[in-house]
C-alpha cells in the first residue's frame, strides 16, 4: 500500500514527471512531496566568484525559489484534492540520486518518482540520476518519461522498414 510518494523535481520546466506523480498519488490516495536537491556551492558558481562575479550565488538561490514556486503552482492547479508539499534540501556531498534516496528514508516514503533523464555524452562515467536512485534505495521507484523522451510521433519510413525486417526474420535458437 502506497501512503507517501516522493517526487524528484529539477530545473527542467517540463512538469510531466510531477504530473505523473500527482496522477499516481491521486490513484493510490497517497500524500505527495516534491523535493528539489540544491547544490548550494556548485562548481560554476564558485568559479564565477573567483573572478568577481558574486551574482552566481544569488542565481543559485533564485533558481531554488523558482523551482519551488513552479511546484506550488502545479499543485494548486492539478493537485488541489491531495495533500502536497514542496521542499528543497541541500546536497550535502555525494550525488543527487543518493541524496534523494536518503531523503526518502527520512520521510519514510513508500515510492519515489523520478524522471528518466538521459546519460551525459561528455561525462560518460556518470550514471543517470534515476539509475542511482533505484540502486541506492529499497523503496519502489517509478521512472517517468518526460515529454521530450516520449515517442508519441510516428517513426520514420526507414525505422518502420527496419522494424518490419526484424519482426519477419526467422528466430533460430542454438541448442546444446
Predicted features along the sequence, with ranges:
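Glycine-rich, Arg-bearing micro-motifs that act as flexible, cationic patches
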Residues: 111-135, 150-152
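Short beta-alpha junction loops
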Residues: 38-41, 117-119, 146-149
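Small/aliphatic-rich secondary-structure junction motif
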Residues: 1-53, 136, 163-176
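Short, well-ordered secondary-structure micro-motifs
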Residues: 17-18, 44-47, 94-98, 124-125, ...
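Conserved beta-strand segments of the P-loop GTPase G domain that flank and frequently precede/overlap
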Residues: 7-9, 35-37, 87, 114-115, ...
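Short, flexible loop segments at boundaries between secondary-structure elements
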Residues: 139-154
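A short acidic, glycine-rich active-site loop
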Residues: 52-69
